[in-house]
Amino acid sequence: MIKLISWNVNGLRACCDKGFRDIFTQLDADFFCLQETKMQEGQLDLSFEGYTSYWNYAEKKGYSGTAIFTKHQPLQVTYGLGIDEHDHEGRVITLEMEKFFLVTVYTPNSQDGLKRLDYRMTWDDDFRAYLQKLNQSKPVLVCGDLNVAHKEIDLKNPKTNRMNAGFTDQEREKFQLLLDAGFIDTFRYFYPEQTNIYSWWSYRFKAREKNAGWRIDYFLASASLADKLKEAKIHTEICGSDHCPVEVTVEI
């Protein structure tokens, strides 16, 4: 049985000032994946006994970035998608394990005014193709901030956000294509109807206090892993970022 955690920390140095180290230790995951680390190599001395860490930094300072802490030695580590257009922002790390691939991702935000929506569409297609290729050789676990609320149940105010970044028809359709390509949204696998549970809240308008949030952080799993999934959780009680950690437990 392995426990995996994914958390968009919205700046790891800031999160460390808000109790990250204690939270990490308490959660005691086999794999702990981070998005939006917002740092460069050497800016933070962070290590945990029993874990090896892998980092993918954005070239732009204080932006994006991903990391994985693992108790288990991977066979191979890959950074990025192998596509130059996508590989300057530190958005993807892949660990090849004996029985599966683990991919963590910080999906590009389409931004205000949907300035980056066209790029996002290209990203979604290329990322889906990347996962499908991995899935041909081993099952895949995918986690991270996918920057999309899949259905109306996945955000507090679907009607007012209909054409906003993260809830456009185009982004939602691309997410559905990813599921159709052979992946399971693990939280919905266990809790298909659960409402009012989110993983991100704006810092504005007392959104977290009012639970006016979005579920945009996911663990996806290859459909072949369905019978091995044991539990999925969203840790809404954990603060330290505008996102909260999400979790999956797998018998693998």
Where are these regions (language model features)?
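N-terminal, active-site-proximal structural segment of metallo-dependent hydrolase catalytic domains
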Residues: 1-48, 58-64
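Active-site-proximal beta-strand elements of phosphoester/diester hydrolases
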Residues: 2-10, 99-111, 143
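Active-site beta-strand/loop signature of hydrolases that rely on acidic residues for catalysis
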Residues: 8, 24-42, 102, 131-152, ...
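Conserved beta strand-loop-helix elements of the APE1-like EEP
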Residues: 61-76, 205-227
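Active-site beta-strand termini and strand-to-loop segments that position acidic
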Residues: 71, 95-98, 222-223, 248-252
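Surface-exposed cleft-lining segments at the edges of enzyme active sites
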Residues: 82-83, 108-124, 159-163
